[in-house]
Amino acid sequence: MFLFYVNPILIAAAVIPAIVLLRFVYKEDRLDKESPGLLLSLVIFGILSTFAAIVTEQIGEAILGILLPQSSTAYNALLYFVVVALSEEGFKYLLLKKRTWYSGEFNCQFDGVVYAVFVSLGFALWENLGYVAMYGLSTALVRAVTAVPGHACFGVFMGVYYGRAKRYDNDGDFVKAKRCRTMAVLMPALLHGAYDFIATMEDPNCEWMFLVFVLALFAVSLKLVRVGSRSD
């Protein structure tokens, strides 16, 4: 309901970064483009995954607060790598697989990247609306070049492994398919956890570490998209 009380400029600032990235990935799908209905449903599934993640994160954070002091490194590591990252990437993956694994449109390996990025950006879009509604335009500008493309990058890594899993499954290599499906959750969760963990460290030197990490994440993700789109 908060959307009805947010300035249209703020809504645009929150939504446009995700739309730009969605369009970019869609254009990179050069072979047998996916139907608009499927892609829209993936964005909606990404939005739905935020609600499941919120509940899981609240429960996980409460349990973690009982077990460890909040000021400890162990608390922060478990919070960001397990409670937050694994919850968010896990629910994205579950809804991604539910919607696309048996879809007749899933006929190219790069489709896995397209699907995962659309789910991830659905998540990022909805999350971004909440942050911008609470904190304003300055937050929108920062997140437009950090958190939103960050979610897209996590989606790229998820999609790379998800697409490989589908290829192996089609070839009858179910062991490798299962291994890739596992990596489709673990790899983006690891990157997501590292992103959050480094971003929240209080050491001033970590600002440079975060910048290097983000630039490397963006560069590798872009390379994976470029190579993947030309490999089918």
What are these model-derived regions, one by one?
Residues M1-D232:
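Hydrophobic alpha-helical segments at protein termini of multi-pass membrane proteins
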